[in-house]
Each structure stands twice: as structure tokens, then as C-alpha cells.
Amino acid sequence: RDKGQMLMLEKRSIGWGINGKSSYVLPCDMINRIIYNSGGYTDTYNKSLDDVWQIHGIDNRYLTSIVCVLQSFKQLFMASDVYVFLSENNNWSEIINSHLGPFGLGSVKHIDTSNGIDEFAVELNANAILIIGKIVGLWERANGKQSVCFIDLTDTGFKIKIESLLSYN
């Protein structure tokens, strides 16, 4: 890492360990194949996911599979025992550096926090969907609330807004 911090990398029988945490290498082509090939499988799609993932700028034929990947990656993080401590000054840059950067998912930038809404920008790259899913998981863990995520695809990346799903929170 660029801050001179050393990470302990170990090869395991299945995958890798980074500082004692299990990690796996996922080929970008695998994620693309999942997104492109699973769009037609809507029989078991939970329609309530449309309430928590609001996506604009992406072709409709890919929305179902993208939402499933987003939700899966968020749930994968939520199933972990990783703590996220958000200070009063919204230290999202530190959270991104410690929870995303070491795993190759650091191409996200915190833009603003106001009125309970956090805004992020994610670069347009092969990991973008994974990054968005995990940042939403980080947000939910840090805030202790279920979220709704608004995703807008632009020419250069994704603009993300995350807020509480429930209006009284």
C-alpha cells in the first residue's frame, strides 16, 4: 500500500489470506459472464430489491443481474464479522482505504455527506459493481440502518447516493 503499511499475504489451499482474512481472485470475465448471461432468469428475482437499488443509465436487460450481483456482494460483506466505525466527521476516506483498498477495490471516492445522504463516485472499471455492493454494505454496517442506493451511470463512472431506506431514520 502507498502508506508504507505492510500486509501479510499467505497462500491457502483455496484462495489467499490477506492479514488473516480469506480472499479470492475473481476474474473480471467471470463477473461479466454472470451479468450478461443471467439477465433472463427473473423467476426467482425478489422484486423488493427494486426498492433498495435504484439504477439509471444502464440497459434494462442487464438490470436484474446487476442488482443480484450488487445485493450478493453487499450480503457477503454483511455476513462477515468486520466492524465499521464511522466518526462524526464522516471519515469515509479512511474506511475506503482500510476496507476496500487492500482488496483492489479502492477506486471509490467520498464526495459529500448532507442530510443523511452520502455521495460517492466510483470509477468506471471492471470492479465497479463489486465496489458499489461493498460500499453499501459498509454504509449499512456503519450506520446500523438498511439503505436505499441510487446509482447513476455517467460517461466516466458511477455516481452513488446512499441513504436510509426508512424515512424516519
PLM region spans:
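N-terminal accessory segment detector
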Residues: 1-126, 153, 157-159, 165-169
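Short, non-transmembrane amphipathic alpha-helical segments
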Residues: 130-144
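Conserved short beta-strand edge segments in small beta-sheet-based binding/regulatory domains
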Residues: 145-150
